[in-house]
Amino acid sequence: MSRALRFAPLVLLVILLAGLIWRLATPTDTVVTSKMEGKPLPAFVLPAMLPGKPALSSQDLAAGEPRLVNFFASWCVPCIAEAPVLQQLKQRGVAIDGIAVRDRPEDVAAFLARNGDPYQRIGSDAQSRVQIALGSSGVPESFVIDGRGVIRYQHIGAIKPADVALIMRQLEQAR
């Protein structure tokens, strides 16, 4: 009896580890349908983050052309990885506006100098109010907005090269 009790913690540990490995190996559904999709943007006006770059408002995003709105930050490591993909989208004719979250102008300027600037406008969301109103919880995160200011798609996390076709398709459907 005591021998069985001695091995019980080891057996329990093996069972827990096996369960953990199984859970980590099981693919999860990475597509999250936003509760904001199909809804108009909440009204907002953000100040310009940088001199020479226009400010950003919800009215700018209802000007007739589908756009990609990208929440980013200079301190965000995945945003650095996403930067070349945003440049690729810009080269393909995608209109991209940025919302800098909890950031400083000098840090954003340095980030864009190092990683490229795909943005037509950059608004400063210093208190994350617009980010929260859109149901976003982190950076990077992007939204496809149709020409009437309605949210058509929410992409959580960095846009990767494999996501470009999906983003282009979402923008085309937003026309």
Predicted regions and their residues:
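Conserved segment of the thioredoxin-like fold in thiol-based oxidoreductases
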Residues: 91-127, 139
